[in-house]
């Protein structure tokens, strides 16, 4: 129910993925700017080692929901969502319709901004 009627950013990443880790600072800024305006972020890790995943969350100071089945790319949730490479993002509108895939940086923030208005 926390997700109902909100814009959702689903972020697929991993602790060992340098571009993913670099993008986390952008996600943090987006989170701070939009968390009180109707944005929910859920990050899904492609890690297979729980300790590395948890350490990356701490190091990057990621306050939103973090999930992982610890099965990596090509298995489990990654296979279910057809994740071939990371970072990968999905933006869902308030009605849970996918409105954008694969955005990063400024383009990601602009799309979220439009979806929330």
Task: Show where each model-derived region lies.
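Conserved redox-active cysteine motifs that mediate thiol-disulfide chemistry
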Residues: 4, 12-29
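Thiol-/selenol-based redox modules, centered on thioredoxin-like
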Residues: 91-117
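Short helix-capping segments at alpha-helix termini
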Residues: 33-37
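Short, internal strand/loop/helix patches
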Residues: 54-90, 94-95
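Alpha/beta-hydrolase fold active-site loops
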Residues: 6-8, 87
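Short beta-strand segments
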Residues: 11, 42-45, 67
């Amino acid at each position: 129910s926390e997700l109902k009627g909100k814009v959702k950013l689903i972020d697929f990443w991993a602790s060992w993925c340098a571009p993913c880790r670099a993008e986390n600072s952008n996600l943090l800024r987006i989170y701070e700017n939009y968390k009180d305006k109707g944005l929910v972020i859920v990050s899904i890790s492609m890690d297979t080692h729980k300790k590395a995943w948890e350490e990356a969350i701490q190091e990057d100071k990621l306050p939103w929901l973090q999930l992982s089945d610890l099965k990596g790319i090509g298995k489990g949730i990654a296979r279910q969502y057809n994740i071939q490479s990371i970072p990968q993002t999905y933006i869902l509108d308030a009605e849970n319709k996918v409105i954008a895939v694969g955005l990063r940086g400024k383009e990601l923030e602009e799309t979220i901004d439009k979806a929330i208005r």
